[in-house]
Amino acid sequence: SKPMDIVFLSNGETGAEENWEHLQRITKNIPNRVVRVDGVDGRIQAYHASAEASETPWAFTVFAKLKVSPKFDFNWQPDRMQQPKHYIFEAKNPVNGLVYGHQAMIAYNKELTLANYGYGLDFTLDDEHASVPLLSGIAQYNTDEFSTWRTAFREVIKLLVDDTEISKKRLEAWLNEAN
């Protein structure tokens, strides 16, 4: 299969330039096409612009707050025999130590992304999705007090709504670690 595009999505985040330059360095010797979508206001509009920038049916979407692991395997491919879905990789949270899909790289399916207008609580989780236990990098959301609070607030709301044991354990870590 053709290597999937890599789309770096940014909109003025602290650390975006450093993470973009880092991504360019670690991908310079691989065949994947790497593009940047920058400055699109609105979450849904940014996701749509990122899908439109991709020339492959799925694309690795790297959010500006993620410092991508140089060990991430960009040869990874989605299971094309299954129903189309988004694939959520893992990221390490430097504040509470959790490792799961929060702030991680996502392999977005282009058609699903363009058909989603964000009517639910979470754009990615509104469509079919699967977790992939591959570490994509370190989430660097804790750059200032407001960004840290806003990111934590959004994630805690999602965890509160998802009444599963794993979400309850993650919620406890968010509420108790590093406070």
What are these regions (language model features)?
Residues 71-73:
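Acidic donor-diphosphate engagement hotspot in glycosyltransferases and nucleotidyltransferases
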Residues 1, 75-179:
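Catalytic-site signature of metal-activated, phosphate-bearing donor transferases
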Residues 31-35, 58, 121:
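Secondary-structure boundary/capping signal
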Residues 11-16, 66-69, 93-96, 112-115:
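Short acidic, S/G/P-rich loop/turn micro-motifs used as interaction or catalytic elements
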Residues 8, 63-65, 90:
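Active-site ExK catalytic segment of metal-dependent nucleases
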Residues 1-53:
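N-terminal anchoring/stem segment of glycosyltransferases
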Residues 50, 57-69:
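Short beta-strand-to-loop acidic/aromatic patch adjacent to the donor-nucleotide binding site
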